[in-house]
Design a protein with these regions (language model features):
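Charged, non-catalytic accessory extensions
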Residues: 2-226
Length: 226
């Protein structure tokens, strides 16, 4: 899917930008999305895979960069855009774009591996968030239950002693309070049983990761030809 997507109009419109660096670089951009139940979008991120090659290398051997060098390449891209370097010669741009389908085919497995790695990392983060929120919910309900139980116990211990001194409407209010606490406790028990699983389900990835090509950028050293 990734290769098919990048071999369409995205590659014919790929940006070719001049750079101060002495190596050529290909930056592939893809969007990774994870969806939960009822098509709820849980995660979005842009993937960047960067490969470099020596402009004078006739074999055009692509070397995929590690995370640190990828960040440096992206910083180099920002610098080139900010400084508005002169445009790369049009004939060079055409040659570089013509080579992109083969480049993308070579990088397909690495891009898919990167997408799989990032998807698993995102799932782990979502799972941790689900546990944190479920545990926080349980903690709040248990604290509420404890306060209600203490209040109800105090009410019950005093009720019989004070009952004869209360008017009928006051006794009704006391009984209404007791009934409310009982209903609230029953609701808390029900929520403790059901809601943690519902919270976890909210953060559960329900479909295969969706990966969409987002663009391709070539950084080309100034004053060089392919």
């Amino acid at each position: 899917f990734l290769v098919r997507g990048f071999q369409g109009e995205e590659l014919s419109r790929a940006a070719v930008i001049a750079t101060h660096d002495d190596t050529a670089k290909l930056i592939l951009l893809a969007r990774l999305s994870l969806y939960g139940h009822r098509a709820a979008r849980l995660h979005d991120e842009v993937l960047e895979l960067v490969a470099e090659w020596g402009p004078a290398d006739p074999a055009r051997r692509l070397r995929v960069l590690n995370a640190t060098k990828t960040d440096m390449a992206l910083a180099d891209l920002e610098t080139s855009l900010r400084e508005r370097l002169p445009a790369v010669e049009e004939s060079i741009q055409r040659q570089l774009r013509a080579q992109l389908p083969a480049d993308v085919a070579l990088l397909k497995d690495r891009l898919e591996a990167l997408a799989s790695e990032r998807a698993e990392r995102a799932k782990a983060q979502l799972g941790k968030r689900a546990e944190d929120e479920a545990n926080a919910f349980v903690k709040v309900l248990r604290e509420q239950r404890e306060r209600i139980l203490k209040t109800r116990t105090k009410h019950d211990s005093e009720f019989e002693q004070l009952a004869f001194g209360f008017a009928d409407h006051e006794l009704r209010q006391l009984r209404d309070n007791r009934s409310y606490w009982d209903r609230r406790l029953a609701r808390i028990e029900r929520d403790l049983e059901l809601e943690p699983a519902a919270i976890r389900r909210t953060f559960e990835v329900a479909t295969a990761p969706r990966i969409e090509p987002a663009g391709a950028i070539v950084l080309w050293p100034q004053q060089m030809s392919p």
